[in-house]
Amino acid sequence: MAESVRAAIGRATALLSGSDSARLDAELLMAHALGVERGVMLLGWLDMAAPEGFEPLVARRAAHEPVAYIIGHRDFWTISLDVGPGVLIPRPDSETLIEAAVDYFGKAGPARVLDLGVGSGALLLAALAEWPNATGLGVDRSATAVHIALGNAARLGLLGRATIRLGDWGDGIDERFDLLLCNPPYIEGHAALAPDVALYEPGLALFAGPDGLDDYRRLAPELARLLAPGGLAAIEIGADQAPAVLALFAAAGLDGAVRRDLAGRDRAIIIRG
């Protein structure tokens, strides 16, 4: 008798027990193998026969490949993004930046949005989806990231309002923006990371010198000229970096405030233009 979806998920959960999200991982992989949404699967597919394609997916996850890379997408804010090797996987923690912007701008929203280090397009495209009248620019040093972000913009119907191109932080940008979003690399070069991050996600998007602050040093002197009067900059930080980043920004004449994520950890520096 063929193994049921329910039983296969249970067995995979045990196999993936080294992951903090083993059950969720197994459910997402099974839904992908079935070609349905996870919620649909949980409501009506659990007693069906498990598909043969499930086992190879579990084996990939057991080798620490991120679920988002295996299934090819990740939800962020109100949108779903295609992701793959060479681009950082969006994290729920980064939604803190969008929450700060929504609190500040309300329904009216910003007119122009800048995303420095656009990656998959998560921050820029979430902002454009939130405010239908906004337009934006996203830049990244990675050609792979630019390619993936452009694909996401096209798939979400946002390409007409989003310009996405190669760029190194603010170099070559000579206009000001109402909303500036940035999730720069901020991990110390010697830091030990979980295998699914260390083995698969791009180091270019993770590491920022011996103290993790190199890219904040690059950003600090550029923010004032990029942020429009009355605008808002939301810049992600590591959980223990607020004092150091605030000091860097203060040295550049910027007055920042700390924004915490839903877990109560320092997650972003907020600067008003």
Language model feature labels by segment:
Residues 1-42, 46:
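Non-catalytic accessory regions of SAM-dependent methyltransferases
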Residues 28-103:
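Conserved AdoMet
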Residues 19-20, 132-133, 154-159, 226-227, ...:
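Short helix-capping segments at alpha-helix termini
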